Amino acid sequence: MIFATLEHILTHICFSIILIVITIHLITLLVHEIGLYNLSEKGMIATFFCITGLLVSRWIYSGHFPLSDLYESLIFLSWSFAIIHMVPKIRNHPNSLSTITAPSTIFTQGFTTSGLLTKMHQSTILVPALQSKWLMMHVSMMLLSYAALLCGSLLSIALLVITFRKNIDILGKSNHLFIGSFSFGKTQYLNEKRSLLHLQKASFLSFRNYHRYQLTHRLDYWSYRVISLGFTFLTIGILSGAVWANEAWGSYWNWDPKETWAFITWTIFAIYSHTRTNKSLQGANSAIVASMGFLIIWICYFGVNLLGIGLHSYGSFTLTSN
C-alpha cells in the first residue's frame, strides 16, 4: 500500500515537472537564454528520476517487472526516451538529441498520465504467458529499441525537411536567373547597381549555407548512430522473444500481428543499415527509409494493440481496461 501511494505521488510530481519543462521549452522558442536551457535540462533530469522511482515502486508492490500492459510499457518508453536524452550529457558531449528526446519524453509521459483511462493505471496479475524470466529481457529490449528508432527516425525526418527547404531555395534562385536572362536590357543597369549589395550578402549566404551543411551532417551522424543502437536492441528483443515463444507456446515464430509487424520493422531498418554502406545512398536517401520506419514502429507498438487479437493481445486496450 505504501508503494502504491508512492507511485501515485511520483506520478503527479512527474506530471507537474513535465508541465513546467514544456512551459520552459515554449519560452526558449521566443527567448534564447542559456539559463532557461539549463533549467529545462535540470527538469529533464528530475523527470528521469521520478519515472525511475515510479517504475521501481510499481515493481515492488505489483511483484513483477512493470511491463505487463500498455500503461506500464508507455511509462518504460518515456523512461527510455529520458535515458537516450541523458547519454550525451553522461559522456560530456553537447546534447544534440535534446530537441527530439525532451519532447518525446514529455509527450509520452503526459499521455500516459492523463490520456489513458484511470482503470488502465491499475496493476493486474500477470497472465500465465507473461510469468517468465524472459519478460524483462524481451520487452525491455523491444521498448528500448522503439525509443531509439523513433528518435533516430525523427532526426531523419528533420534532415529531410531541411534538405527539402534547401532544394526549394536553390530552385527559386535558378528561376530568378532564368527569367533575368530574357530581360537583359532592362536589368543590366539594375544588376550593376545591385552588384555591391550582392557582394555584401555573399558572406552571409555562404555562412548560412555552411551552417545548414553542418546541421544536416550532424543530423545524419546522430540519426545513424541512434538507429544503429535501436536496431541492435530490436534484434536482441526479437531473438529473445523467439526463445520465450518456444518455451511458452512451443514454436519460435507464429506470425501473429505483433510478430509480423516486428519483422516488418526489422526489415525496414535492415534496409536502412544497408543503404548506409553505400555513400551515394547516405543522407537524404537513407533518411527516407528511416522516415518510413517511424510510421511502421507506431503501427507495430500502438496500432496492433487496437486490434486486440493474436498471441500478444494481453497488451491491448480491451484487456487492460477490463
UniProtKB/Swiss-Prot annotation:
Keyword Transmembrane helix: yes
Positions of disulphide bridges: none
Subcellular localization(s) per the UniProt record: Plastid, Chloroplast thylakoid membrane
Cited InterPro entries: Cyt_c_assembly, Cyt_c_biogenesis_CcsA, Cyt_c_biogenesis_CcsA/CcmC
Transmembrane intervals: 9-29, 43-63, 70-90, 142-162, 226-246, 259-274, 287-307
Pfam families cross-referenced by the UniProt entry: Cytochrom_C_asm
Record's subunit section: May interact with Ccs1.
Function noted in UniProt: Required during biogenesis of c-type cytochromes (cytochrome c6 and cytochrome f) at the step of heme attachment.
Family: Belongs to the CcmF/CycK/Ccl1/NrfE/CcsA family.
The protein's name in its UniProt record: Cytochrome c biogenesis protein CcsA
Naturally occurring in which organism (per UniProt): Chloranthus spicatus (Chulantree)
